[in-house]
Amino acid sequence: MANKSLEIRFLFPLVLFLVVKLLCVDGKGFNNNGHKIRKGRWEGKLKMNFYHNSCPGAEDIVRQIVWKKVEANRSLAPKLLRVHYHDCFVRGCDASLLLDSVAGKAVSEKEARPNLSLSGFEIIDEIKYILEKRCPNTVSCADILTLAARDAVSYEFERPLWNVFTGRVDGRVSLATEAARDLPSAGANFTTLQKLFAESDLDVVDLVALSGAHTIGIAHCGVFGRRLLNFTGKGDTDPSLNPSYASFLKSECSDKSLRLNPSAVVGMDPTGPLAFDSGYFVSLLKNKGLFTSDAALLTDPSAAHIASVFQNSGAFLAQFGRSMIKMSSIKVLTLGDQGGEIRKNCRLVN
């Protein structure tokens, strides 16, 4: 029996390796259909160390400020990651989400309903202020946000988890109506999610990997409360939800009268809201995905299979980095592109 246990223990990593290899394309990324993932539209526009000559040390400044902030408040990591995600899915990664509304003009993205719970903007403001004093009119808000999101997640690992290609400029248009239309909803089904991601040049593997960002952070019960107490309008619970997890969520989200308390919060990953690891996927495969959009991943065979592979933290972290590089390159504006600028203040166009 001891020999058999030893054999299984050594065999499991080999099996996992073979599964990952089967899903990999040239060792560089997953693909849903066996074809090599084509390089992003940003290639040739962005590059590593873009500010090496124009603002030496800019990326170090971003990292130092972000790590200091996250060390003091670990909840900032998911907050900054979410701001970056919400920015990129509307008009691309152009920092349009950072713009405040201006009287007499259209309401900005920041005031769209899906963005009302976002926070962490003041950290981007602080970084921008320091970089403007050091290198005026040089480092874009879009690049600052992209770097800050990466560094916030990377803090616990004490090293960058993925490369950030820089050289973005900032957009001048920000519309709440576009945010309401383009941002994936926590209540979306798989078909809707796949369509929205495909429109941004992201495939099923990216969809699953980026959903893994839910391994950190919290959510208000009002966002998913219908799954618990009124799934079909008859006071029932979503049958796809793990019963024990549903009971736990009801206890956390209900007031003394057993009614939903929409302002109550729970960790998005039941294994813990702080560690950036594969806990989200381990829980998901036990039907403990918090949102309808999480559970939706299990309704598609390819997505469910990818999620099962991502129960291995190494496989998840590697692909998450690749998918973040793709996401952070959606519809980027660079120097010379119409409609772009280097803002002096991330909240206002020049």
From Swiss-Prot:
Disulfide bonds listed in the record: C55-C135, C88-C93, C141-C346, C221-C253
Cell compartments where the protein resides: Secreted
Cited Pfam families: peroxidase
Keywords assigned by UniProt, alphabetized: Calcium, Disulfide bond, Glycoprotein, Heme, Hydrogen peroxide, Iron, Metal-binding, Oxidoreductase, Peroxidase, Secreted, Signal
Induction of the gene: Up-regulated transiently by a cold treatment.
Keyword Nucleotide-binding: no
MF annotations from Gene Ontology: heme binding; lactoperoxidase activity; metal ion binding
Reactions that this protein is recorded to catalyse: 2 a phenolic donor + H2O2 = 2 a phenolic radical donor + 2 H2O
The EC number(s) this enzyme carries: 1.11.1.7
Cofactor: binding comment: Binds 1 heme b (iron(II)-protoporphyrin IX) group per subunit.
Chain residues that bind Ca(2+) 1: D87, V90, G92, D94, S96
Site annotation Transition state stabilizer: residues: R82
Misc remark: There are 73 peroxidase genes in A.thaliana.
Family: Belongs to the peroxidase family. Classical plant (class III) peroxidase subfamily.
Entry protein name: Peroxidase 24
Natural source organism: Arabidopsis thaliana (Mouse-ear cress)
Gene encoding the protein: PER24
